[in-house]
Amino acid sequence: MGLDIYIEKISDYRTDEKGRTVSTRTQIGNLHGCSNFLDELNNSLNSGFGSGATYSFCEGKFFAVRKTLIEDLAESEKKLESNDFSDLYRFANEDDEKFNKRNKEYIEDKIRQLKFEIKSLDEFFKENDIEVISDEELDELIENGGEDCYGEEFEVSASW
């Protein structure tokens, strides 16, 4: 039993009655039986795997931009290096030492998870012939790609 990856087009961003940003998702394709994909990724699929990359489809090929994960990793590493956790949650009556220790462990764990997700995504992209490109390259591809290129955002979901 392999992992089935579903690619959805994201469109029509709007705010719902509770003030949350929501969008319309239309399934446009899937990649079946990705059995070589890392089993451990199952744990991270429900915690934002899809938000890790933006996808586009051009001339029969998928392209991916991992900007969100890369930026989050850089920001987390910078936060750990500077030891500045001031924007993170502080429990009531928590002294500075406990606060810093707890948040340092949290950031270290987050960095490990992000590195794992980036590595897993890269392996998935390689196995499925999805090229990783920058935002600028994606914009240029869409602009110059003609009718077979879609400029919408795509996201991945998965089922086992």
Predicted regions and their residues:
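Acidic (Asp/Glu-rich) sequence patches and key acidic residues
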Residues: 1-160
